[in-house]
Amino acid sequence: MESRSILETIQMVAEENLDIRTITMGISLFDCVDSDGERARQKIYDKITTSAKDLVKVAAQIQEEYGIPIINKRIAVTPIALIAAASQDQDYVAYAVTMERAAQALGVDLIGGFSALVQKGYQSGDRKLIASIPAALAATSRVCSSVNVGSTRAGINLDAVGEMGRIIKQIAADDPVNCMSLVVFANAVDDNPFMAGAFHGVGEADRVINVGISGPGVVKRALEEVRGQSIDIVSEQIKKTAFKVTRMGQFVGSIASERLHVPFGIVDLSLAPTPNEGDSVAEILEEIGLESVGAPGTTAALALLNDAVKKGGVMACEHVGGLSGAFIPVSEDAEMIRAVSAGRLNIEKLEAMTAVCSVGLDMIAVPGDTSAATISGMIADEAAIGMINNKTTAVRVIPATGKGVGDAVEFGGLFGQAPVMPVNTNQPTTFIKRGGHIPAPIHSFKN
């Protein structure tokens, strides 16, 4: 490696907030299926704790040896609705508690996979799992849950969309902060290393290592060098920077895979912000030329950023996967927090932005009196964007119980704080109550 490249990487880590956001081990639980729920849960605990026993230790070794910060160590498992369905259990909270115990024993930050895939309808375990989500999140602190309600090939399960609005309200009634551990997806991916939406897909290997990178600060600093130049140069600069950032993810993932004796899966190319100053996706958009994120042109600037990150990153690693784009979680981005608080960025503009970037309406706080139907409508809109555009979209929304516009919900750490945003108060109740299934779009028929 050239000396200049080494020095560049050191500078990125020391001054520009470059890090590996997560090393996530995916673990299949299909060999844990049992008609006896208690036996199944013991198998799950044993499989997770055996498979990932060295994950935290190896991550610490890599960080120490190479000076590359590795922020999170995480686990994703097969959707529990598929595993628990064979048992006679009527309530799946105990499975979440088992996941929590395993995560605590290993010292990992989060564990995902308390999930159900209902894009085309419910199977026997799906309804039980969804009904268990509020109690499961209340009983745990490291467990993450997700439900996939639509896809380009299957359409949108409007019954599930309606149910998830009610579930989110139920969670918020107990503790709004628990809502940050639940994501409602369309076109969920099997190899996502990021939480709260990670689960281990049914077509994945028995165990796999996936890596998520982070580097908004690096991209912003690089763009400062091309101020006043054409947008072509901006795109090229982002591509070059994304290559360097992703190369580090490939390097760390390869070493972790080798030391853990687990196959290396993918690098997720997503730019993931944090509440730290200088680590913001919104600031990149402003560096491209917007007076503020939320201004006309925001969606175009984000589309440019997202595409350039993919083009640069895809050359730097063996396999790209996950969500791979730019995240726009309001509470986790310092400049977005300021823009929302000042009224420069609203939910409608964020929804437009989700058509061209990773995921969707993420870490958004809404007034506590927002109806379940309104939340379901937000989910339906995002699922429609994902379904029609053949991309992953999602909603992670926090109804701030007892709070209104102008207040804030404090999460702490990497999750930051979310200003409560105004929501259109016209109700979609009759639409959501219709239920049924929104058919897949005509362009989904590829065969």
UniProtKB/Swiss-Prot annotation:
InterPro entries: UPF0210. Signal peptide: none annotated. It comes from the Bacteria. It holds the Pfam family DUF711. Belongs to the UPF0210 family. Homodimer. NCBIfam families: PRK05313.1. HAMAP family: UPF0210. This is UPF0210 protein lp_2507. It comes from Lactiplantibacillus plantarum (strain ATCC BAA-793 / NCIMB 8826 / WCFS1) (Lactobacillus plantarum).
